[in-house]
C-alpha cells in the first residue's frame, strides 16, 4: 500500500506576488524615494506624437533612460527638442507597468546650462536691487506727447518692423531715430550699452525704446548684463524696454523706466494715437468754448448794467454842480435861521432887562458887585472842586497795584491766575507766577512756612 507522502506547504512560506503587484510596488517605491529632480542628458529618439505627447530617450556616455512629456506640460516648453540637444529635465521617476520599464515623467525642460544662467540672473537682480537701481521712486515718467522716439535694436530685427508699423499706424507725425546695434551674440551687450549711451548723449529723443523679439534665454542674455542695466539707469532719456514675449523678463526690464511685454507694446506705450490726441484737443476746445461763452455772457451783463448808469461827462458835471448849489443853499439857510432867532432873543432879553433896571446909580453898582461876588464864588467853587479832584486822583494813584510793585513789592498768582494772599494757599513744588514792576517770572515753591519766625 502506497501512502501519500507529498509535503504540505509550511505556514511561514513567503507570499507569491503577481507581476502586476510587483510592478505596482516598485512604482510606489520609485516615486517615494526619487522626488521631483533635475536630470541632464542628450536627446535621442525624439518623437512628437499626434496626441501632443513627447517621447524620447535621455542618455549620456554610459547610460540611458526613457522619458515622456505629456501634452499638458509640453505646451509650456519654449523650444522644440531635436536629436542631439543637450537638455535638463525636471522629472519624476516612474514605472511603466505594461512593460516593466522605469522612465522619467518630465514636468519641465530647458536647454543645458540654463540653470546656471538663471542663477546668475537672480544674483545680478538681487545685487542691483540692493543698490536701488530698481527703486520705483527713481523711475521717470514717460512723456505723454513724444515728438521724437529713439529705437535701440538691430536693423534686421523683425521687432523693428513691428515697431515702425505700430508707430506709423498710431502716430505718423512722430519722428523716429534708429540707433542700430546687434541684439545677441558675443559682444552685443557692450554694443547695446554703447547705443543707449549715444542716444543719451545726443539728446535727440523724448523717449527711447530698447527692443528685440523673442528667443531662448541665451538669445536674450545680452539684456541681462550689468553694463546694459546701469547704462539704462544712467540714461538722461526715459527708457521703455520691450524684450521677448510677455513671459520673458530680463534685468533690462527691471532697470527701465517702463517695461513693455513686447516690442509692439513698447511702441504703443510710447506713442499716443493721433485720434486720441484729436479727441482730447476737441474736448479741451469744448471746455474753452464753454468758459469763454460764460465769460462773454457775464461781461455783457456787466457792460449793460454799466451802460445804463453811464452818462456824458458834461451832464454828470452839471448834475453834481446842481447838487453842490443845493447843498450850499441849504447850508446858508440852516445857519441864518438860528442866528436870526438868537439875535432876536438876545434883543428881547436886553430890553426886558433894561426895563427892569432901576434908574439909580446905587442899584446899578449893587448889581455889578453882586455879579462880581457870584463870579468869585463860582471861581472859588471850581478851584475847590479841582483841588478835591486832584486829592482823589492822588489817593487813587496810591492804590494802583502798579505803584505798589514799583516800590519793590510783588504779586503772586497760581496756575489758574488766582492771587495768592496766604502761605496756606501754596504747596511745595507748586509753580506760581510772580508779577514784578517790569515783568513776570515763573517760580517753583520749595517749601511753605505759614508763620514768620
Swiss-Prot record:
- Pfam families with a match to the protein in the record: Exonuc_VII_L, tRNA_anti_2
Name a biological process GO annotation: DNA catabolic process
What keywords are assigned to this protein? Answer: Cytoplasm, Exonuclease, Hydrolase, Nuclease
List the EC numbers from the record: 3.1.11.6
Record GO terms (molecular function): exodeoxyribonuclease VII activity; nucleic acid binding
InterPro entries listed in its UniProt record: Exonuc_VII_L, Exonuc_VII_lsu_C, OB-fold_nuc-bd_dom
Gene Ontology, cellular component aspect: cytoplasm; exodeoxyribonuclease VII complex
Q: What is catalyzed by this enzyme? A: Exonucleolytic cleavage in either 5'- to 3'- or 3'- to 5'-direction to yield nucleoside 5'-phosphates
Origin: domain of life? Bacteria
Compartments, record wording: Cytoplasm
Q: Which family does it belong to?
A: Belongs to the XseA family.
Q: What role does it play?
A: Bidirectionally degrades single-stranded DNA into large acid-insoluble oligonucleotides, which are then degraded further into small acid-soluble oligonucleotides.
Q: How does it assemble?
A: Heterooligomer composed of large and small subunits.
Name of the protein: Exodeoxyribonuclease 7 large subunit
Lineage summary: Bacteria, Pseudomonadati, Pseudomonadota, Betaproteobacteria, Burkholderiales
